[in-house]
Design a protein with these regions (language model features):
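A general structural signal for short secondary-structure junctions and capping/turn motifs
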Residues: 1-2, 48-53, 108-111
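Short, structured patches in soluble enzyme cores that scaffold and shape functional sites
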Residues: 14-16, 63, 120-122
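N-terminal, Lys/Arg- and Ser/Thr-rich interaction peptides
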Residues: 2-26
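Internal, well-folded beta-alpha domain core
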Residues: 68-246
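Glycine/small-residue-rich interface belts in oligomeric ring/scaffold proteins
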Residues: 23-91
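Extracellular structured ligand-interaction cores
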Residues: 7, 56-58, 113-115
Length: 246
C-alpha cells in the first residue's frame, strides 16, 4: 500500500515492566498478544488528545519483551444492577451503596520488560500527529489494562520523517507486518486478525462491532527484501490501517 514517498509521523518509544495485551474472549486464563493491538494504540492516542470521535490513522507496531509469566489473581466483579441477582448472598459495601458481587480465581499472562517502538500518523491531519507528540510528554501514557502505565523514552520519542527505501539491517524488533507484505518478503510468523477500531455504541448492553486488519507477527532478526518505509534512524516502519479510510 503506497502513501507517497515520505510523511511525518510520531515515533513513540515506550517501556513497560509488566503488561498484558489481552486477547479478546480469553477468560479464566487471560492470554496476551505479543504486542499491543492497533485498537489499543488507537484508543490511547484518541484518549491523550481528548478526541470524542474516531479519526483515521496509520500505526506501525514493533517491540521486544524478555519473558512471560503467569500470575494467579483473585477477581471480583460487581453487578451494575444488584436486582439482577436477587439470590446472590455475596454483598459488598462500595462507598455509600451495597453491591452484589461474584469472585473467582483467574490466571493472567504478563509480558516482562517490554520495549515498544510505535509509529503513529493521523491520515490527512498532520496537526493531530504533532499534538499527540506534545501530549505524550505532558500526560500519563497507559497501554493495555487500565493500570498498565508506560514510561516514555523522552530521548528517542520524536516527530520523524519516513521514506521509502531498503533497510540494510535485519529487524531489531519483532513486529506486526501486513499479511501481503510478509508474503512478498517470504517471511513466516504467527498470523493474526487484529482489532483496529469498533463502531460507536450507546451503552454497555450493546456489543462492540470491530473492524479487523490481517497481519503477521514476525520475529526480530528477519531480513526485509522488498522496499519499505524507513525512519530517520533506519528503523523499518510497517503501517497497519483500515482500507478506504480518509
Amino acid at each position: 500500500m503506497v502513501y507517497g514517498n515520505s510523511m511525518i509521523v510520531l515515533r513513540l518509544v515506550l517501556y513497560q515492566s509488566m503488561v498484558n495485551y489481552r486477547i479478546e474472549n480469553s477468560f479464566g486464563h487471560v492470554q496476551s498478544y505479543p504486542l499491543p493491538t492497533p485498537s489499543m494504540i488507537r484508543g490511547m492516542a484518541h484518549d491523550l488528545l481528548d478526541l470524542k470521535e474516531y479519526f483515521p490513522l496509520r500505526i506501525s507496531i514493533q517491540g521486544n519483551f524478555e519473558s512471560a509469566v503467569v500470575n494467579m489473581q483473585r477477581v471480583m466483579k460487581f453487578d451494575r444492577d444488584p436486582k439482577s441477582r436477587p439470590n446472590n448472598p455475596y454483598l459488598v459495601e462500595v462507598g455509600t451503596s451495597v453491591k452484589t458481587a461474584t469472585h473467582s480465581i483467574s490466571f493472567v499472562d504478563n509480558l516482562i520488560n517490554c520495549e515498544l517502538i510505535l509509529h503513529i500518523a493521523f491520515k490527512n491531519n498532520e496537526e493531530y500527529t504533532k499534538n499527540l507528540h506534545q501530549q505524550v510528554f505532558q500526560k500519563t501514557v497507559v497501554l493495555g489494562r487500565n493500570d498498565d502505565i508506560a514510561r516514555v523514552d523522552f530521548n528517542k520519542t520524536k516527530l520523524t520523517e519516513v521514506k521509502l527505501g531498503k533497510s540494510p539491517e535485519r529487524l531489531k524488533y519483532s513486529a506486526y507486518i501486513l499479511k501481503d507484505i510478509a508474503h512478498k518478503n517470504q517471511i513466516g510468523g504467527t498470523h493474526y486478525k487484529l482489532p483496529f477500531k469498533y463502531e460507536p455504541v450507546k451503552d454497555f448492553n450493546e456489543n462492540r462491532i470491530f473492524n479487523f486488519v490481517e497481519c503477521v507477527y514476525v520475529s526480530k532478526d528477519e531480513q526485509l527484501e522488498e522496499e519499505f518505509y524507513i525512519d530517520e534512524d533506519n528503523l523499518p516502519v510497517s503501517f497497519l490501517e483500515l482500507d478506504n479510510e480518509f
